[in-house]
A protein has these predicted regions:
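Structured catalytic-domain cores with a bias toward divalent-metal coordination
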Residues: 1-425, 510
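Extracellular and organelle-lumenal recognition/adhesion modules and their flexible linkers in secreted
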Residues: 424-597
Length: 597
């Protein structure tokens, strides 16, 4: 650190002398230079690998190399990753048995941060390992996020062991079985929500009471994973009500422990997440995942973070939502990353747990200092209301057992583009309700173009009134997601009025949670630090609390008041899940006015 005292020079000198040189970031390059990690890891049951950004190529490659060491030499049999548990099972099926393909399975986890060349290569290495070794390694997500796939997975399991209970869950849990309706769960009447939680509690009790019978009908592992689906569903449903992340890290730690229990005694796991989760940090009196895991497994964990001085990474831009490459210059003086950079080593690791307990290095390792910490979104204004910055305050030895340092980084390489739906200009009133046009009807907008997006096009089928129809359809290897056809309307002429949007629908959908819906969504003014690209709707109203399956033409309608704060609103046609839906005979009305379009 330029201009700092002799003690700081002593720190830099200690870093140079204690550094573990790393020969390469490239996987499949041998393990010789990683030998010092044997002592760092020791008899740990969990090795938790962090990353200073969610979009750095070198961090992913280094973590891949450490997984190779842990699996090949140290007996680890599980990789847990910061991704949704239910969706991750498709990746596990691929790495274990070659079911499906790696690219689809990875994209199906829905976390774009992992949908990169580096993680895809990791998955292919895991598949190679399992094809050539008797001791297998498994892939699990440990995040609770979206309720729908958890609900569907739970119903699938129950259909094998308790068909009557599965049928009851199809009905009772219906609002949570679709990606579109699950976020509206908090709007349901309290009695309806309580009925859902009561049903989940009954299911969890049945897992305990019927354990021996259900294990005999399936397997011990299936029983554990089925129960985890129920727990994750309960966690996700509660999040849809309070929208609070205060328990996020605790829940991730609980899910990790549940997965290790499912895999059996002696299971050892490598975890992948952001430094902010992997470390033993405390944020507003809430521990990070690493802190909770220490409590739960008795410090049988080693936390290895990553750090960098300068370079590129990928993240979604705050203002546009577009996933793109960003770069930063050298770390600011005094930052943990800057001190590591002063040692002048381009690629190294540092054992913090076994560093000196006195002297300049010990004092530095116990001190508070900033460390770069960049998540999935970059470019927050300095005064943003969330208080997001590009650094966290750390105490190095308290937070990490070791760190891997890369002087200059490059951005992770994505497997597919992530481009948000453009922010369309609001029209003064709905148009083309007749659905004219051969492809996507003029004046309407869709999110088509992504992997396994729903296909949207004009249909030859006539509506009940003999009019034109549009078909929204998809047959994908995953069960989540929905296809939308929307129009954005200025709220100026409609504030204070009640809107009604109606359509005739017909569906071909045979999966739980699949079907058709209509919706109205009211949006605030875009601009200022309060929103960036990620605008939180003021309100959303749907035609029903669950998607509608109707092989014959039927009519749906949704009504809602326009909030005074609304700047614009969307009218939308939705096909939830896999299958097909036809829409026609659209009507829009501002009730109480002369407007009827």
């Amino acid at each position: 650190m330029t201009g700092t005292g002799a003690a700081d020079e002593a720190v830099v000198e200690w870093i140079r002398s204690a550094a573990i040189p790393l020969a390469t970031v490239e996987p499949r390059s041998g393990l010789k230079d990683l030998e010092p990690f044997r002592a760092i890891i020791g008899d740990a049951r969990i090795v938790s690998l962090g990353e200073a950004t969610h979009g750095t190529r070198e961090f992913r490659k280094l973590k891949h190399r450490l997984l190779e060491l842990c699996v090949a030499e140290l007996g680890f049999t599980m990789l847990g990753i910061e991704a949704p548990f239910p969706e991750s099972l498709a990746v596990n099926a691929y790495v274990l048995d070659g079911i499906g393909n790696a690219a689809d399975a990875l994209a199906g986890t829905r976390y774009w941060v992992w949908d990169t060349e580096e993680v895809l290569d990791l998955i292919e290495w895991m598949r190679w390992w399992n094809e050539n070794n008797a001791r297998k390694v498994k892939f699990y997500g440990f995040v609770t996020d979206f309720p729908a796939v958890a609900a569907l997975g739970l119903i699938d399991f129950l259909s094998r062991v308790a068909p009557d209970l599965a049928a009851a869950c199809k009905t009772e849990l219906a609002p949570l079985t679709s990606d579109f309706t699950a976020p509206l769960f908090g709007q349901l009447a309290e009695s309806r929500r309580e009925a859902v939680f009561a049903r989940i509690a009954q299911v969890l009790a049945a897992f305990a009471q019927q354990r021996s019978e259900w294990v005999a009908a399936t397997s011990a592992l299936d029983w554990h994973l089925g129960r985890l689906h129920a727990n994750v569903l309960d966690q996700a449903a509660r999040f849809e009500i309070d929208r609070s992340y205060t328990s996020h890290d605790r829940v991730m730690a609980e899910n990790v422990c549940a997965l290790m229990e499912a895999e059996g005694p002696g299971t050892k796991a490598v975890l992948w997440s952001h430094n902010a989760h992997a470390s033993r940090a405390t944020y507003d009196d809430e521990k990070s995942m690493g802190g909770y895991l220490d409590e739960m497994i008795g410090r049988a964990q080693r936390v290895i973070g990553t750090s960098f001085d300068r370079g590129a990474f990928q993240a979604r831009a705050y203002t546009t939502g577009v996933l793109t490459d960003h770069s930063v210059p050298a770390a600011p003086p005094g930052a943990f990353d800057a001190v590591l950079a002063q040692a002048g080593l381009p690629l190294m690791a540092l054992d913090l747990a076994n560093a000196p307990r006195d002297g300049a290095a010990a004092t530095w390792l116990a001190s508070e200092m900033p460390m770069r910490s960049i998540g999935g979104i970059y470019g927050f204004p300095s005064d943003n209301k969330l208080g997001v910055t590009d650094t966290n305050t750390i105490k190095p030895r308290e937070y990490f057992d070791a760190v891997m340092f890369v002087a200059e980084t490059t951005a992770a390489r994505r497997n597919q583009p992530l481009v948000p739906t453009p922010n369309s200009v609001a029209s003064p009133a709905p148009s083309n309700l007749e659905l004219c046009g051969d492809g996507i009807p003029a004046g309407w907008q869709s999110g088509a173009g992504r992997r396994y997006a729903h296909a949207i096009a004009a249909s030859d089928a006539a509506s009940p009134n003999g009019g034109r129809t549009v078909r929204i359809s998809r047959d994908a290897p995953w069960r989540w997601g929905d296809g939308k056809l929307t129009q954005k309307i200025s709220a100026q002429a409609f504030r204070g009025k009640r809107l009604r949007f109606a359509a005739a629908i017909r569906t071909e959908a045979n999966d739980v949670g699949a079907g058709a819906l209509l919706y109205l969504q009211f949006l605030p003014h875009r601009g200022g630090d309060e929103s960036g690209f990620f605008v939180t709707p003021l309100a959303t109203a749907a035609s029903s609390t669950e998607p509608v399956w109707s092989p014959e033409w039927s009519r749906l309608a949704v009504e809602a008041e326009v909030p005074e704060a609304a700047d614009s609103f969307l009218i939308g046609l939705v096909m939830a899940g896999n299958g097909a839906a036809w829409f026609g005979d659209l009507e829009f009305a501002a009730i109480g006015s002369r407007a009827f379009l």
